[in-house]
């Protein structure tokens, strides 16, 4: 049983008050593998990966689902094997990530290449290894991929990343579907009235023609009527009085015409033009990160389905797949919200089914890319406590609950922003517990800080810890399985900690600790 719901499934507290991982105490892990230390419950990784794959399939039971693990969250050969054995593909976005996954024995057909600035070498490797998808991120990229594929005598599978205009995610840096950022191609032309897309919200109220409806059948659905309107509008854009259509159909036709004029459709046409060497497999949308419910996913999905419908109307090609990206939230502190996966995926599935039926389109393959959700709660970072320094505060100081405070204890540990940059970069909140003993019942307001020459070197901004916390204690910070090791740095020439895999079977090093010799070997100056 986990220490609390935010801790790894294999964690517990023994009779002595020590935190354990599959029976191994935190103290024993530090003694064997060193401090600081990333601990990953690999049994929990496997369970969570399997859970997402099954939940997606259950929710979207009228179509095929694919789930890819976002390798940027945590990547090693062992993690690659675990998630692929659990039914996932793996998203990569650099040569390093690609080579690690391939070295783990993952076949190219289980890999995806993302990236807003792919090198020719990365594209060539993806094509040579037969990657499941190369996600196009900008208008000039299809021609580059086509040229490389032609030179290699192969056909590349490609998908277009679209910025839907739906904003989600807690911090600006992790909200990725608004137009003013580096990823993807915009759905709508500059200056377009996005409110016209609100017609999609009414489609679920229309009597559907059925999920397998095809265009051209005897009884037209609203989507078919709108398609005829769209085809006419493209030919005669200034006259909409040629036939009597309902207001809803007219609004849908206007929305489709607007999408038809957008950059995304133009890039889809460019990809399709190279169909001798490029296989167009679908569209991709990633709206942000750490999102608590399906609302924004639903809006983005509706827009992707409208793009899919519009491309069918203009080019008679049905995009096989729609990738809805990642961003599914986890709780970082006790009491914090996290996504109810089954409930929210069911809501998303209902919305996707309804809009496709109303548009008269067959259901596409639906894909997801959970990274944080898969591994964040499986990881804990262990530190050794050093300096413990009480600081007197001004009379106006308050804690985050609004209570007046006169003292804060600064608890310094032997790591910091070099092994967890997220608090400094995003203002992310974490919690902590003494892991080697029970501690006193009396607590004090503490701030856990690192060892770096930086005032922003904060690991946990505010937490109540036992008043008797002291030098030499082991401090555990949970929910660090995602973006701890992968965003680690050598700031102040600190050594990046080891990653240890703990399971019912054993505890072993997954990624070794850096050494001073590594730093000296990299420095080749005289």
Which positions does each model-derived feature cover?
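Conserved, mostly hydrophobic/aromatic
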Residues: 45, 72, 94, 126, ...
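A charged N-terminal "starter" segment
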Residues: 1-157, 172, 192-215, 221-250, ...
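Active-site-proximal loop/turn and secondary-structure-junction residues that shape catalytic pockets
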Residues: 73-75, 96, 117-119, 138-140, ...
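Solvent-exposed alpha-helices and their adjacent loops that cap or buttress functional pockets
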Residues: 103-106, 127-128, 150-153, 175, ...
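Charged (often Lys/Glu-rich) extended helix/loop segments that serve as interaction or gating elements
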Residues: 353, 357, 361-526
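The start of beta-strands in P-loop NTPase/AAA+ ATPase cores
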Residues: 89, 132, 156, 281, ...
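Hydrophobic residues within beta-strands of alpha/beta enzymes
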Residues: 90-91, 111, 134, 283, ...
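Active-site loop/helix belt of alpha/beta enzymes
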Residues: 2-3, 165-392, 465, 492, ...
